[in-house]
Amino acid sequence: MRWLKALAIGFGALLGLLVAVPFLVPLEHYLPAIERQVSERLGERVKIGALRATLLPVPQLAVREIEAGERGDIRVSKVIVTPDFWSLLGSPKVIRSVEIEGLEATPGALGRLASRKPAADRGEVRAVVVQSVRLTSARLRLERAALGPFDAEIALAADGAFSSATLRTADGKLVAEVRPAQGGFFVEARARGWTLPAGPPIVFDELRLKGIAHAEEASFKEIHAKLYGGNVNGQARLRWRKGIELSGSAAVNGVELRSLAPLIAQHARVSGRLTARPVFRAFAAEAAQLASALRLETPFEVQDGVLYGVDIGRAASLIASRQENSPGGQTRFDELSGHLVLERRAYRFTKLKIASGALAADGHVSVSPEQELSGRIHAKIKAASVTAATVPLNVSGTVQAPVLLPTAGYVAGAAAGTAILGPGLGTTIGATISTTLGRLFGGESAEEKKAPER
């Protein structure tokens, strides 16, 4: 929070100059000198749009349309400085309050200002004491989104040093406390009914996090969330010195996928309660590119759910009995497990296992960034009307319209068995031999073989 104090002191110092200036004199004449002084204090180029001083009902200085930084990456609509009038005649000058309205800044800009040493550390005489600072309608500006608006109350010690700050979103759903710690700032945040302001609009029933923020990184060792009927506990680190780097891990338990899955992966249609242990990392030049650069890996298990848009059991039973399969339907399961690798918007599901009553299936499926499917599922149906056989199904189509078709080897084996031994038993024996030989001689994909065990 050093940058807030520096900003307040910079404008507060101007009041000492303005005491001797008649209030009817246009203050725009003094803008170049004022901009120069504030720039020197902040260590950033500063541009001011307008100044106005008033005596009644209390002496105040209003500064409007402020830009700081070479690219204007700090912007303020208005700053109102209210001094202790009589202190302006002596030293130090006391500023009762500084109100900053409509602040917009990038993380990098705030990091630059926060890294500046306060005047006392640089051996300068402290000529201005600020008693309180308040922000309204502030926003943290990202490349394609903004965090906020939020309000903040900043408490200062008797010597003007930063003591603590409380930040609240305009709707009151998120509250954060900040105070100095370990050469940076300790951050503790709490939220209820809060929606992510950037990225997928995930809604948190409850969110609590604790961590330490520095000028170029923030590390959160405790993250606890309740969402979609389950909970997530984890840790994360965000760095922004050269580009944006995000890393972390989490434990996910009992999260219902029906509403959450489409928010994370477009067109994903699945329900059930998820258990997972993801480890993730992303590095990008800009924050907006993080999603595309994300790499996530996790074992997973989904209980009591449904895969919508495809009926694996029906496809396997119809093909096994030599009937034509039609697309669509759904696959209910007691348990779906496997291993997921997400990398640059492509999903690889390996070590897949599906269990549900008469259905047992395993295999691997990949989803391209364009939502195209590829892979193979081996399905086995236990039914009185059909002799049990494992049916290998090639997976194709898209996430919206998946297609399951028997492999060429399975079709050929089933046809040969039928020709030699007749339909029914002959078909099953021929198909089984073909499937077994296929698995023995290269039937599994390389990615399925190399996937780590759970």
How does the language model describe each region?
Residues 51, 61, 83, 93-95, ...:
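Glycine-rich, small/hydroxylated-residue low-complexity segments
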Residues 117-207, 344:
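Elongated, acidic membrane-bridging lipid-handling scaffolds
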Residues 45, 71-83, 143-158, 169-175, ...:
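Amphipathic hydrophobic-ligand
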